[in-house]
Design a protein with these regions (language model features):
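Non-membrane alpha-helical structural segments and their capping/turn regions in soluble enzymes
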Residues: 248, 291-302, 334, 338, ...
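Catalytic His-Asp segment of secreted/periplasmic serine-dependent ester chemistry enzymes
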Residues: 238, 277, 284, 320-398
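Surface-exposed amphipathic alpha-helices with a cationic face
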Residues: 301-309
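Active-site-proximal beta-strand/loop segments in catalytic clefts of secreted hydrolases
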Residues: 63, 131, 194-197, 231-237, ...
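N-terminal secretory targeting modules
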Residues: 1-194, 204-206
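Conserved SGNH/GDSL esterase-like catalytic core that processes O-acyl groups on lipids
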Residues: 20, 41-47, 70, 74-79, ...
Length: 398
């Protein structure tokens, strides 16, 4: 995969802070229907996101990282969310790109809108609407949004009500970031959460913002010190292997998804369970990937640490959570998980460690997730489990 280039030729300046983000993925449909492979033509997409920090100006990032041809964005708006696909009266703001209403993003690239005056508070939901008049081809997207996106035929970018948006999807399309500026002196205190489906929030309730990074942002806001907490988890992602439906391997996408975020101080890494459970024999519906050793996973983590330290970032390692009775459960896999966790806890390679394994484990059966925290598949936490994970993080240390 070619390295992503910024279409507008600019780099983020010191005034912008990441308020929301997601990691772009290759157009696939491994978990059920979505719109990524068919793309769009004369469609309006409306997407709802919750920002973790506030400001007085906003801009969005759009990605055509995995597009097969240039992507024409005919127009875009941002507004305050009302209910569903509806937005609040008087809140719609037209976005521009280099002072024009439209923009063409080359295949493999991304771009930012111009900043627009838009006062928004921490934990407030925004609605971003894109009008795509021309055929797009397959769409760069993010599979698991745990949020509803909406589609309408024709141009409805400025509609206040959601009547025209008769179709819905549980993925995000093209939208990869929301940044804010103003409202506070610039400071480098942002947090990136990086990982797989447990960071992505699989198992949490829809449209509830109960992923562990969401819960962490709520804790900061409740403590009176809101800050940007952005989520770069991809369900199924591995440290060491590319999967077409689960993103580039962590050691590669870290450069694109984490190291380009503005004003970040700390990265939290929770990744490796798919290297263990997804390697070797094929899981139904998935292609097999090479067998991955403990040593390879550890070396992948060391590479993430090297990349973070080279950019002056503090990096926190999280232990891998229980797999007993899940699709990944085996004696071999449990031994690998234990070995990786032992290294994370004792090596001193990470600047700090958060022991998510012990947070969500059943004290009486530590290889198993506590039933009260189990989403039902014995691998992913539920809302209560994600809340417990966020509570385990020391705000002052972060």
């Amino acid at each position: 995969v070619a390295a992503e280039q910024r279409h507008d030729g600019t780099w983020r300046d010191g005034a912008w802070r990441g308020a929301w983000a997601t990691s772009p993925q290759y157009p696939t449909a491994p978990f059920g229907p979505n719109w990524s492979q068919q793309g769009f033509s004369n469609h309006t997409i409306r997407q709802v996101v919750r920002v973790t920090t506030g400001g007085t100006r906003a801009r969005i990032e759009l990605s055509n990282r995995y597009g097969t041809k240039p992507l024409r964005i005919t127009g875009a708006t941002v507004a305050r969310t009302d209910k569903g696909a509806s937005v609040k009266a008087g809140s719609v703001r037209q976005l521009s790109f280099g002072k024009g209403r439209s923009v063409t993003i080359p295949a493999g690239a991304s771009t930012y809108s111009d900043g627009v005056p838009f006062t928004v508070g921490a934990l407030e939901s925004l609605t971003v609407t894109l009008y795509l008049a021309e055929e797009t081809g397959p769409a760069t997207f993010h599979t698991f949004s745990s949020a509803t996106s909406y589609r309408a035929d024709g141009d409805h970018r400025s509609d206040r009500n959601g009547t025209a948006f008769t179709e819905s999807s549980d993925s995000w399309y093209y939208l990869s970031g929301v940044e804010v500026s103003g409202g506070q002196a610039p400071r480098r205190d942002g947090i990136v959460t990086f990982g797989d489906s447990i960071t992505d929030g699989v198992g949490s309730g829809p449209n509830a913002n109960n992923r562990y990074p969401d819960e962490l942002a709520e804790r900061f806001a409740a403590a009176g010190k809101p800050r940007g907490v952005v989520n770069h988890g991809i369900a199924g992602n591995q440290v060491t292997n590319d999967w077409a439906w689960a993103g580039e391997k962590g050691v590669e996408r870290f450069k694109k998804d984490v190291l380009t975020e503005p004003n970040v101080r700390t990265v939290i890494v929770l990744e490796g369970i798919n290297d263990i459970g997804g390697s070797g024999p094929s899981i139904p519906g998935q292609s097999p990937t090479p067998e991955v050793s403990v040593e390879q996973i550890v070396e992948g983590h060391r590479e993430l640490i090297r990349q973070a330290h080279a950019k002056g970032l503090r990096i926190v390692g999280a232990t891998l959570t229980p797999i007993k009775d899940s699709a990944y459960d085996s004696t071999v896999n449990e031994a690998k998980r234990d070995a990786v966790n032992h290294w994370i806890r004792t090596s001193g390679a990470y600047d700090a460690v958060v022991d998510f394994d012990r947070v969500v484990a059943d004290p009486g059966h530590p290889d198993r997730m506590l039933p009260a925290y189990d989403s039902g598949d014995h691998l992913h936490p539920n809302d209560a489990g994600y809340r417990a994970m966020a509570q385990a993080l020391d705000l002052d240390a972060l």
